[in-house]
Amino acid sequence: MADGSRLPESATSTTMETNTNEHAKVLSPDAETVPSSSMTATSSELSLDGRWGERDQGEPVSRRGAMEDFEEMRRELTQLSLRRTRSVGKDAHRLRSRASGRASQVHDEEKAIDEEDSTIDGDGDGYQGGFDLGEFLMGGHLERRTTTGEPAKKVGVLFKHLTVKGVETGASFVRTLPDAVVGTFGPDLYRIVCSFIPQLRFGKQPPVRELLHDFTGLVREGEMMLVLGRPGAGCSTFLKTIANDRGAFAGVEGEVRYGGLSAEEQLKHFRGEVNYNPEDDQHFPSLTVWQTLKFSLINKTKKHDKNSIPIIIDALLKMFGITHTKNTLVGNEYVRGVSGGERKRVSIAETLATKSSVVCWDNSTRGLDASTALDYAKSLRIMTDVSKRTTFVTLYQAGESIYELMDKVLVIDSGRMLYQGPANKAREYFVNLGFHCPEKSTTADFLTSICDPNARQFQPGREASTPKTPEELEAVFRNSETYKTICDEVASYEKKLQDTDQEDTRRFQKTVAQSKSRTVSKKSSYTVSFARQVLACVQREFWLLWGDKTSLYTKYFIIISNALIVSSLFYGESLDTSGAFSRGGALFFSILFLGWLQLTELMPAVTGRGIVARHKEYAFYRPSAVSIARVVMDFPAIFCMVVPFTIIMYFMTGLDVTASKFFIYFLFVYTTTFSITSLYRMFAALSPTIDDAVRFSGIALNILVIFVGYVIPKQGLIDGSIWFGWLFYVNPIAYSYEAVLTNEFSDRIMDCAPSQLVPQGPGVDPRYQGCALPGSELGRRGVSGSRYLEESFQFTRSHLWRNFGVVIAFTVLYLIVTVLAAEFLSFVGGGGGALVFKRSKRAKKLATQTTQGNDEEKVQDVGDKAALSRGEAMSASNGESFKRISSSDRIFTWSNVEYTVPYGNGTRKLLNGVNGYAKPGVMIALMGASGAGKTTLLNTLAQRQKMGVVTGDFLVDGRPLGADFQRGTGFCEQMDLHDNTSTIREALEFSALLRQDRNVSKQEKLDYVDQIIDLLELNDIQDAIIGSLNVEQKKRVTIGVELAAKPSLLLFLDEPTSGLDSQAAFSIVRFLKKLSLAGQAILCTIHQPSSMLIQQFDMILALNPGGNTFYFGPVGHDGGDVIKYFADRGVVCPPSKNVAEFILETAAKATTTKDGKKIDWNEEWRNSEQNQRVLDEIQQIREERSKIPVTETGSPYEFAASTMTQTLLLTKRIFRQYWRDPSYYYGKLFVSVIIGIFNGFTFWMLGNSIANMQDRMFSIFLIIMIPPVVLNSIVPKFYINRALWEAREYPSRIYGWFAFCTANIVCEIPMAIVSSLIYWLLWYYPVGFPTDSSTAGYVFLMSMLFFLFMSSWGQWICAFAPSFTVISNVLPFFFVMCNLFNGIVRPYRDYPVFWKYWMYYVNPVTWWLRGVISSIFPTVQIDCSPSETTHFNPPPGQTCANYAGNFITNIAKNGYLLNPDASADCQYCPYSNGAEYMATLNVHDGDKWRCFGIFLAFVIINWLLVYFFIYTVRVRGWSFGMGYLFGGMGLVIDKVKGVFKRKSEKA
């Protein structure tokens, strides 16, 4: 693009036309074609015709193609409009008349796109006569134009004297476990309350500082402004301020106007018209592209125009070249879906569907390769031109082609405006100030370098006179002609608004008002009514449910399998009195299980907040609409869950087969599940994080279970639990339990079971027997179910429908709280933050010198001060340090490398015959298009592949790789994988101590770490926590960790510049170059190399998709060697073209020679002279190096450090991790305290009645409530540590599997002891258990073992399971089996044969319960209350003792008579002491130490399973046949689905 082709913005009417026509030149394929003497497709053309995502699918982003698609959509909408017009002809006629009148009066100065539209269509009359969209266009549809063709919504953005202030947070210290514990008692609560009610803050207010200083400027409609600056300069702050997203700032001064609208008016009435799009693509992964766009349009299209939605979606898909992804899941990093580039386009299309007028895009090219980034920018240009939007963009690495698409540029440094004006004049402006622009530097890189003291260059002789500081550069700019022009533009724009009486603004307001549904207030920011918002969200909830079929099918599998297992436990339940209590247990499980399973609803409720918040800003819907929609969706979803569960449970457990009773049972299971789900969602809405939501929900459910009336009868709760008895009345499950229990037992007369008849034996007259069941009547062998419930639980059937109403009322209450919380609470952070340090003298000293503003980027002054030196000069001492990094002269070669993986029913080759070598002092750039196999080759060379087949020769000095190869190489992951709670120094020391040779002393290793910290210039922030670092600092730490290992052979780096701004990327590559010059061999993948970056590399290894090499050789001066290779084959690189982009685009496109022959670049390389030279070089290296005698340069061990050293250092690190991440340990303490208090004080000082014995049993049993909550914290922590070990630390041979297992196990022990002690103290003594040391000590030991069992249980499950999904599915199964098959809920004697002789005994909880019960119960003497005794009359003339003595002594052998001398109404107590009571539980006196030993064995087995599964599954790769199992299940499911699909097609 010629510099003179773009004029500075002015108030003239020709400016926009000039700019738009210029963009047509840039974007049009016709303008892009450059003739070539040898090729039919030139590199210039290639550079502007890239694709997003997969190279073999997507479509090129073409502005002309997009405009044609847009016109096709308009024609289709015309037909739609015409059909509608026939029915409302008169209205349309009036509308056309008004439009015609306006057209004669109003002159639109921005017709460029309309002119091009008519050129494309070629039929001017087509729009005059046929395109009668009248009402449709005035309703605010996509193009937002009037009937005359002018934009209906034109909103320029004007900002005057804009100053933004943020709170100075300062460098903070890491929060540790003691801080969390102390915070519980007030400080944390105070901070939370003050965050919602700032007026409650007292004391000195935190200081504020300016984030942006006095910005003035204008961006007209249809213009794009590029905002440039280093991370932390204030770019995101500026964009958020323009987007009116000001919640994170302390204050905003000055004026921002949108046309004639103030910021306040825009926020209140037009929020969705100004949008901010963050750099991350946040979408629901299980929605398809079509569904994502349809949902957006549903909420932005009034009902009258709903038929236009499919037409607009098709146009958007065509416009952005993603039609082929229409029915593909959007996906994310965990769910497979569209590619990253395609997901970017979905974000753009969604934003276009919002029909907003101003859009701010924040660094949205992060992670994209150069070609994809260009296509992204072209798409923004399309969006801006087609819909006349006002667009702001920040980009960290912008190529020249991207820069040329922009109208204006704004350069920011430290919140100061260094330049604002025409993009094509920015370079000239700074050159005139005295700065030097390197020949190969892009304009964007040059402008960004102005903000970096170490990167900018001055013209010779002007170093002193050129302004340098942000303040000086700002002052110079304010005195420049460019700034005066801006001020004139602003004044002219304001004058135009006044002269036209703000006609555009009024038209904008009218258009927005007419775009709303009739039932929506014209002052509302939303387009459709709240009811339609809810309906749209309901539709999306259904899509989400159906889109994630794996989770859906898994949930049904869990429901059905658990229903079968549990109902089989109660199968064949006797209908007489012996089955009464067990029947109550089955009913209790029925109303509880599905609610418990619904804990999975917490995850989508919390993780979807970011999307909901963004959609609120887009004015799609109110957040409360989502909450209500989820409830609406629960009706059918829960119904489908309850149907199979209730049918299985009801009929297999032998409940009363009466239609009315079954449907009442079904109703209460359904409503209870609904209520519990609503309760979970309420906690999710009130919780900042998913950990908090799980913790609170789990504890709440446990408390509800205690106070349901099953564990302790209703009267016992109310009278006996003096602190918490009231919880029964606020417990919806209690009302449901009363309902289902009375429903089952009412109108039922139970025959007394022979075993419960008192007395029994020879000579006993049946007329003089009683039944040992509460509710039995004197002289009757049958027991009324209603009377039984009244006596045992104080339940009555007359409360049935009252209880139903109460459950509904609680559900509504939870829903109301959820809706209010969703509407008024927001836990979505604004990003950014200060450095966090560990507490040390060095860090404290630094913290007093450092302050930090609350900018949106991670603005870290300390980090900037400690930045890598980007100047050319280097001290002699640093030079010596670099020379000491690598002293190895070994050469690594690879030849004919191929890598094949299973794919479908066959295989796929990802690498194909790759050859190469890495010499000391040589830096190789590994390049290729997306999917070419760069990372695959890097992992293969580093010997990190875990699946598939690798073939080829990998040699070091001509010899096979040794056991220490991986230890001798460094591998820098792209994702910067670290323990985020470690400091920089700790991470480097950990790497050095474990990876350097074991013969090197510890002091030498630590001294070496000091050198690395000096080289990386991390001294000032060496005590900073890694998790608080910015992107560049983390990259430096990643490199430092690998250098600290002192790799003796090779350093691999995977995308070390990804996500960095251009200057940070250059500094990283410059640093690598210095390492290379010092003798280090480096192989590095890179995907957005500028010309300056690529010059730092010595060689390029370039791959095409399929892992085919198409170039391996030197770069040459200014890329001369690469250019010559392609020029010799007829492809000439333009002088200004980036060499890296040139070779990638050339190889990716099918090119032909003059004679029409297509060039296969892969084959061209294989047959080239250069390839033969590479093969000869590899052979020569092998022959020469293999003759050199082998010298022992280090230990031959696989791991440098001993297993003991590995274990000790890793244990120390994990302890430190738990200490600095207090939520983990704190969560365990919190659960122990809460459950301990509720357990202990609910069963306060139990007496000696039978009911109290049952209370003792359940008090002991309630420890099983802790595992579901605790395991949900253990599993994620272990999983994260395991992922880090598998991804980086084991492949680098830092430490082995034994050390990993041992350290994780050991670190759980202290907290298990502490939390078990807390639980034991809060539970044991308040209940009134024996206080003698032997019993109390034994129970404490068992409690401690149980907590150790929990941690090891979660660890071995996590060690085996491949993913969180599998873990979440496995855990409920284990919980059900352990909680039910232990002899408490259903007595052992009543077990079905199938379970009786194995499940009971392999259940660890069985032995824990038996051990504790056998320790506590024997010493208790039972005193029955009269209501607990069995009543019977002796025959006339006999006393109770005479009549029942033989029964008590010889048959029952238990119990005693309360009135042995009475001759009527004998009262028999079935137990005289605890030993007799526990015998009914299959527990015997003297079992305790046997049970202790067996339970200890289970704990040890758990630990051994951790070692076993980590070694077999993670190290050896065993699957235990699970792959075949799941593969077979998948085939079966596919066949079944195929059958149904064929049937539906036939139908």
UniProtKB/Swiss-Prot annotation:
| Compartments (UniProt record) | Cell membrane
List membrane-spanning regions: 552-572, 586-606, 635-655, 657-677, 698-718, 722-742, 804-824, 1230-1250, 1260-1280, 1309-1329, 1334-1354, 1356-1376, 1397-1417, 1491-1511, 1520-1540
InterPro entries assigned to the protein according to its UniProt record, in alphabetical order: AAA+_ATPase, ABC2_TM, ABC_trans_N, ABC_transporter-like_ATP-bd, ABC_transporter-like_CS, ABCG_PDR_1, ABCG_PDR_2, P-loop_NTPase
SMART domains named among the record's database cross-references: AAA
Keyword list, A-Z:
ATP-binding, Cell membrane, Glycoprotein, Hydrolase, Membrane, Nucleotide-binding, Repeat, Transmembrane, Transmembrane helix, Transport
Leader peptide range in chain numbering: none
Chain positions carrying an annotated carbohydrate: 299, 363, 905, 980, 999
Indicate, by first and last residue, each region the UniProt record lists as having compositional bias (Polar residues).
10-19
**Residue stretches of biased makeup (Acidic residues):** 111-123
Q: Classify the protein's membrane topology as the record does.
A: Multi-pass membrane protein
List positions binding ATP.
Answer: 928-935
Region Disordered: start and end of each range? Answer: 1-66, 85-123
The protein's annotated catalytic reaction(s) are: voriconazole(in) + ATP + H2O = voriconazole(out) + ADP + phosphate + H(+); fluconazole(in) + ATP + H2O = fluconazole(out) + ADP + phosphate + H(+)
Can you name one GO molecular function term for this protein?
A: ABC-type transporter activity
List the record's Gene Ontology CC terms alphabetically.
plasma membrane
Q: What is its main location?
A: membrane
Q: Give start-end positions of Basic and acidic residues composition bias.
A: 51-66
* Low complexity compositional bias, start-end: 36-47
Domain of life per record: Eukaryota
Q: Relate the induction remark in this record.
A: Expression is induced upon voriconazole treatment. Expression is increased in clinical azole-resistant isolates. Expression is down-regulated by tetrandrine and posaconazole in a synergistic manner.
Q: Where is the ABC transporter domain?
A: 197-439, 892-1130
Provide the family line. Belongs to the ABC transporter superfamily. ABCG family. PDR (TC 3.A.1.205) subfamily.
Q: What does this protein do?
A: Pleiotropic ABC efflux transporter involved in the basal level of azole susceptibility. Confers resistance to fluconazole and voriconazole.
Mind telling me what this protein is named? ABC multidrug transporter atrF
Q: Which organism is it from?
A: Aspergillus fumigatus (strain ATCC MYA-4609 / CBS 101355 / FGSC A1100 / Af293) (Neosartorya fumigata)
